[in-house]
Every structure is written in C-alpha cells, then in structure tokens.
Swiss-Prot record:
Species annotation: Saccharopolyspora erythraea (strain ATCC 11635 / DSM 40517 / JCM 4748 / NBRC 13426 / NCIMB 8594 / NRRL 2338)
Keywords, ordered alphabetically: ATP-binding, Cytoplasm, Fatty acid biosynthesis, Fatty acid metabolism, Lipid biosynthesis, Lipid metabolism, Metal-binding, Nucleotide-binding, Transferase, Zinc, Zinc-finger
Chain positions covered by the region annotation Acetyl-coenzyme A carboxylase carboxyl transferase subunit beta: 1-253
Similarity remark: In the N-terminal section; belongs to the AccD/PCCB family. In the C-terminal section; belongs to the AccA family.
Gene that this polypeptide is encoded by: accD
Cofactor comment: Binds 1 zinc ion per subunit.
Main localization of the protein described in the UniProt heading: cytoplasm
GO cellular component terms, A-Z: acetyl-CoA carboxylase complex
Reaction equations catalysed: N(6)-carboxybiotinyl-L-lysyl-[protein] + acetyl-CoA = N(6)-biotinyl-L-lysyl-[protein] + malonyl-CoA
Protein name in the entry: Acetyl-coenzyme A carboxylase carboxyl transferase subunits beta/alpha
Subcellular location: Cytoplasm
Length: 568
C-alpha cells in the first residue's frame, strides 16, 4: 500500500544540498523534484499518484487568488482530560502547532471559485493526523453556521484518521455536533459538498465527511469508517483488492464523483454555477402538441420497432445536448450505483434542474453494461435520492423514460425490487417542485412509471407506453408470442392512443425518419417542450403542484372521466 511522500534521506546519488529538493513517489518509486511536484498539485508526473497535500496548498489550488479570508485562527484546543500517553497531550499539541503554524487541524474561511462565494473548512492531516477534537468540531460547526447565515455553499475538504483519542468522549460528540449543523444546511436548501482525500477515516467519514449533497473523492483516496488494520485485527477478515478506495466507494454507491486533483476546481465551479442559476426566460414555443393527429396513427408493431431502435438518443445524449453545465451524480448512498439509471444536475435556459433517466446505450458492450436499461433496486434508490435533491433545493425535476421494464432477476427481488419501485412512485407523487416526465423510447410497465409520475407527461412520436410488453401480453393471454402485433394494437400503446387516453399530455414530434436520424434536431425539439412545460408549471406553488399531480393521476379509472377513454 502506498505511503505518503517524503524527502530522501542520504541518497548517494544526490548532493547534500539536494536532499530536501527531491522526493520519491510512494507508488511508482520515481524521483520527483519537489518544486515540480508542487507545480503539479502534488500529483506524481510519472504515474499520476495523488500524494498528500498541505492544507494551505489545498486552499490555494481551489479558491480564486486572494479571495480566502480565514476565521477561527485564534481558537485553540484545551487538554480537558489531562491526557498523557508516551507524552503529555499538551506537548503533542504544541509540537503540531509549531510545525503547522495553526492552532488546530482545520483551516476555515470564506472565498470564491470563479467568483461564486462559498465557505470552506479543510482538515490538515499534518496536524495530529487531521484528528477531530473539540475545537476541530467547533470550527467545522462554525463554518456550517457561517454558510447558513450567508446562504452560501459549504465545501468540506476531509483528510483525517478519525476522532482524537486524547479528548475522549468530547471528541466523540463532535460527530453529532457537526452532523446536526450539516443537517440544518440540508433543511435550509444550502449546498454542501464533501471532498474525500487520502486518508479519511473514522468519525469524519461517519459524520460530515459523507453528508454532502455531493460527495467527491480524489483518485485512490482511502476512505472508510474502520481502517484496514482495525478490520484485520478485530475480525481477522482479509480485504479485497481496492477496498475502501475512492473508486470502490463510487461503485458501491457512496461517492458521486472521483475527480483528479487538477480537475477539482473546475468541477466545483460547475456545481456552484448550477446552484446559483435563476429563472429562465419564457419559452418561445410550446414544443409539443396536445391533440391527436389521425394522419399520425401508425401500426403499433411499427412503433414498437422504432421505439427499440438503439440509434435513438439516450438519456446521456439528451443531457449533453439539452442541459448546460450538466454534472452526472452517482450512487444511491445505500448499496450501489446502477448504470441503467443516469442522474445529475444542470441548467435549462439558465434554470437549475435535476435530471433522472433510464439509460440503454448504442453499442452491444454498453447495452450489456447498462443492463439494457433495466434498473436494479439501486437504480430506483438513486432516482429517489435525486428527487429528494430536487425538492431540497427547489429545482424542477426532468425524467426520461426508456426501459423495457425493471430488472426481473432473483437478485433484484432479493433486494426488494417492488419496494424500490413503490417508494420511487410515492416520492415523485409527493414532490412540491415541477416534475416533467418524457417517454423517449420504451415505457415498460412499473419500471417506467417509477420515473413517470410527472405534473406533465410527454411522449415522443415513436415511443410507446404499456402495462406489459406486447410479447409478454401475447404469451400470457394467447399462450404464444406469435400474436405480439395483435397484442400491441389492442394495448393502445402508441403516442396517438396515449394522447387520446389522457395518459400523456402531449406528443413531441420527431424529425423525418425518427429521432435516431437527427439527435440534434430531436434534442432541440425536446428542449423547447421542456422549457415550456417547466415555465408553465413554475407559476404554481408547491401545494398547487402537489394537488395538480394528484388530480392528474386520480382521474384514471374514474367513471366520471370516461370522456378520456379511447374510442373503439
């Protein structure tokens, strides 16, 4: 396992004056000139290994030059327990203070990134291993309170071995103290970004370190609650390769983004831009039609084939073309990151939005990797997490529906597929922000509806929406899949049928030959429909949005609304 970089000790190849000018990369073992290393952000120029970075260099690398204004520098820790191990705690503190030039293991202040204001609290691993004592927690809490008072985002840079044992339960209580301050920011809709650097363990991971609305980590950063040595010595368990690394945690659904150090400032700037967005100008056109066109009626089996064309734009394609500053966020914070669901934030005409959608792909390898757009429970958990995100910040929600259905495997059932879908539907139904759902390809049963409980539901011209796949319907009702075309016709799955039924509120027409023929034109039409829909819905307050959505779905199956039923 890699060790922190250190200066060379009596290397015979170097003159004495050079001993403090070079260091050896703990990963690839190459010699690196210290000035070059610092210019490269303490990242090895040969292997890209991210070495530990001093807290002052960290602040300098992230914030606009000259913008940092420190607070809390005069607050110093107290030896409340009179603790002594091999040395008195007071001696350890004094030594750490001399070496670091700071009173504590955290540097707090205000500043800007690309002009956007924020509050930052950065832990200093060089000060007693970044351990959290009473004053450390107090300063982190003060940073959170400052962010709340100013209603500016809080960025927490974490590097810590955990709680400071020399302060006993006073240290332990900082987990609760800092967590409740972060919770207040969540309640107030103030953005919190947590950045995990190497290493981040113990009480920091189990409190503010993993409570960010967005959790970012540097490549290779070791992050966990119990460290590897504790696990091995306590329960004698061998650990898998890559365990507790940033990449491992991203795949496990706990981290949104693994970002190389030289890209971190740009990623933060994008997040801040999205969260500082305002209202959009009125849409110039509606972008969709609300009346069926008899001439547009097509054979249902033809629509079925078109909806499944792997050349059609995917959710990722729409995110890249429609939303400015789109940032994909990963993970459900419970069990994993399902690639069959793409989620993130961006802006639409200057208005911040949250986006969630099924994701298939265009090539065989991606289709397999995305499970053909069939989500596992983790995918629906991720979607629900992003619905919470939308409501927390008052952002409209846009969902793209394109799935043959939820994954039907044993593993999905064991992890509660039905519950995951039900909770997703329930959460979307209760949102007090505008929600617009668009069926862009396949709308397969409950797995589709989980992302389809919008205030406004649109469908693309060549998409379909159905209670079951026509093949499944044919097999169950006729005992053979040979009557799929008949089943498709009788299920009334086409855009025109759905509009007559009132299941959708509008149809977005596709370019000649279908959406797969011109991604840019399709994205432009869909962007117009989304801007118009969100603009209209944004005129309603939260309670009115909730009531409108409830009434929209209440009418289905109500005999008093028989006028919306399809005519034979």
């Amino acid at each position: 396992m890699a060790e922190p970089a250190r200066t060379l000790a009596q290397d015979p190849r170097l003159a004495d004056a050079d001993q403090v000018r070079w260091t050896r990369c703990p990963n690839c073992r190459s010699l690196v000139y210290l000035r070059r290393l610092r210019r490269n952000g303490h990242v090895c120029p040969d292997c890209a290994h991210h070495m530990r970075m001093g807290v002052h260099d960290r602040i300098e690398s992230l914030l606009d030059a000259g913008s940092f204004e420190r607070f809390g520098a005069d607050v110093a820790p107290v030896d409340v327990l009179g603790f002594t191990d091999s040395r008195p705690y007071t001696e350890r503190l004094a030594q750490a203070q001399r070496r670091s030039g700071s009173n504590e293991a955290v540097l707090c202040g205000t500043g800007t990134i690309d002009g956007a204001p924020l509050v930052v609290a950065a832990l200093d691993f060089g000060f007693l291993g970044g351990s959290v004592g009473g004053v450390t927690g107090e300063l982190v809490a003060r940073a959170a309170r400052t962010a709340l008072d100013r209603r500016t985002p809080l960025v927490l840079v974490c590097a810590s071995g955990g709680a400071r044992m020399q302060e006993g339960t006073i240290s332990l209580m900082q987990m609760a103290k800092t967590s409740q301050e972060v919770a207040r920011l969540h309640e107030a809709g103030v953005l919190v970004v947590s950045i995990g650097t190497d290493p981040t363990y113990g009480g920091v991971t189990a409190s503010f370190g993993m409570l960010g609305d967005v959790v970012v980590a540097e490549p290779g950063a070791r992050i966990g609650f119990a460290g590897p040595q504790v696990i091995r010595q306590t329960i004698r368990q061998e650990l898998p390769a890559g365990f507790q690394t940033a990449e491992y945690l991203r795949d496990a659904g706990m981290v949104d983004l693994v970002v190389p150090r030289h890209e971190l400032r740009a990623h933060l700037a994008r997040l801040l831009r999205v969260h500082s967005g305002g209202t959009a100008a009125p849409a110039a056109e509606r972008g969709y039609r609300t009346r069926p066109r008899p001439a547009a009626d097509r054979d249902a089996s033809e629509v079925l084939h078109a909806a499944r064309d792997i050349g059609r734009p995917s959710t990722s394609d729409y995110c890249a073309r429609i939303f400015e500053d789109f940032v994909e966020l990963h993970g459900d914070r419970v069990s994993g990151d399902d690639p069959a669901v793409v989620a993130g934030i961006g802006t639409l005409g200057g208005r911040p939005v949250v986006v969630v959608g099924h994701q298939k792909g265009h090539e065989t390898a991606e289709l397999v990797q995305r499970n053909f757009g069939m989500p596992q429970p983790a995918g629906y958990h991720k979607a629900r997490r992003m619905m919470d995100y939308a409501e927390r910040f008052g952002f409209p929600l846009v969902t793209f529906v394109d799935t043959p259905g939820a994954h039907p495997g044993v593993d999905a059932e064991q992890r509660g597929q039905g519950t995951a879908i039900a909770e997703c539907i329930s959460r979307m139904a209760r949102l007090k922000v505008p929600a617009v759902s668009v069926v862009t390809g396949e709308g397969g049963s409950g797995g589709a509806l989980a992302l389809g409980v919008g205030n406004r539901v649109l469908v693309l011209e060549n998409a379909y929406y159905s209670v079951i796949s026509p093949e499944g319907c044919s097999t169950i009702l006729w005992g053979t899949a040979e009557r799929t075309s008949q089943a498709a016709e009788q299920l009334r799955i086409t855009a025109e049928d759905l509009l007559r039924l009132g299941v959708v509120d509008g149809v977005v027409d596709e370019p000649a030959g279908g959406a797969q023929q011109d991604h840019a034109a399709m994205a432009s039409r869909l962007a117009a429909a989304l801007r118009a829909s969100i603009g209209e819905l944004s005129e309603l307050d939260g309670d009115a949005l909730l009531d409108q959505r409830r009434r929209r779905f209440d009418r289905f199956g109500d005999p008093d609304h028989s006028d919306s039923e399809v005519q034979p």
